[in-house]
A protein has these predicted regions:
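Catalytic nucleophile loop
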Residues: 107, 124-128
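HTH-adjacent hinge/linker in prokaryotic transcriptional regulators
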Residues: 2-9, 13-28, 34, 40-102, ...
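Conserved phosphate- and dinucleotide-binding cores of soluble alpha/beta proteins
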Residues: 2-12, 19-23, 30, 45, ...
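Short glycine/serine/threonine-rich phosphate/pyrophosphate-binding segments
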Residues: 108-112, 215-218
Length: 254
């Protein structure tokens, strides 16, 4: 197993368990303790993890942690899958027949797209994945916002996408995020963040679609404030403290 594969596996184990010992990682990957220690030291130097006695813990488990690693589209599909399903089911209940809806990028929004009611809708999206899910739906009028293609998230971004969005009227926007902290909503990429910011500014109703693992985290680019949103759609069993943190700024829908 090459170093990049080992370190990806280490990130995955820490994401799932929070804290992992050197022996646990060594056994899981079938490599020596010394190799794992070198990997952990390198990841710690990048700020992705924290070294603890005998192992490591995820840096993202600290309160107010800065996200250091942007997960790929395929990696995100496997994380918090049940929560994403619950959020998507609740979010589609907010959609009204005949409305123009913006669906952003992200795996939770894709779950929404797969559950859309079978009535007439106009869907605007910069997500190739959302477009592919809906292109056979005859009851959905589709507008794919083109531009520069960002493969990591299957998203179209850049000036062309922004110019297209500026010309459109949107009834409701449903957008995901990587971090929610102190009322700020953030994502990992500035170009994607500008699209999300613009889509919210054009929408009459603005909904953030995010599971509670995003709360207390921040990422590189802040694209909106919770105070400017109509609601955050979360999973039903959100922690009381997390709910209270959001409700200081806007409504929580579960």
């Amino acid at each position: 197993m090459i170093k990049a594969e080992r370190q990806d596996k280490v990130r995955q184990l820490l994401e799932e368990q929070g804290t992992v010992s050197v022996k646990e990682i060594s056994d899981a990957l079938g490599v020596s303790d010394m190799t794992i220690r070198r990997d952990l030291e390198e990841l710690a130097s990048l700020g992705e993890i924290e070294r603890v006695h005998g192992g490591a813990r995820s840096a993202q488990n600290r309160p107010h942690a800065m996200l250091r690693h942007e997960y790929s589209h395929s990696e995100k599909r496997t994380k918090h899958a049940e929560e994403k399903l619950q959020i998507a089911r609740r979010a589609v209940e907010l959609i009204e027949e005949g409305s123009t809806i913006f669906l952003g990028t992200g795996t939770t929004v894709e779950q929404m797209a797969s559950m859309l009611p079978t009535f007439r809708l106009r869907i605007v999206t910069n997500s190739l994945s959302v477009f592919n899910l809906l292109e056979a739906r005859e009851d959905c009028e589709l507008c794919l916002v083109g531009g520069m293609y960002r493969r990591r998230t299957a998203a179209f971004v850049g000036p062309t996408a922004e110019d297209t969005l500026r010309a459109l009227g949107i009834d409701a926007a449903f957008i995901g995020a990587n971090g929610i902290l102190d009322g700020d909503v953030s994502t990992s990429n500035m170009d994607e963040g500008r699209i999300q910011q613009l889509a919210f500014s054009k929408a009459d109703s603005r909904y953030l679609i995010a599971d509670s693992s995003k709360i207390g985290k921040r990422d590189f680019y802040t694209f909106c404030r919770l105070d400017n949103l109509d609601a955050v759609v979360c999973e039903p069993d959100i922690d009381d403290g997390d709910r209270a943190a959001i409700e200081e700024h806007t409504q929580v829908i579960c």
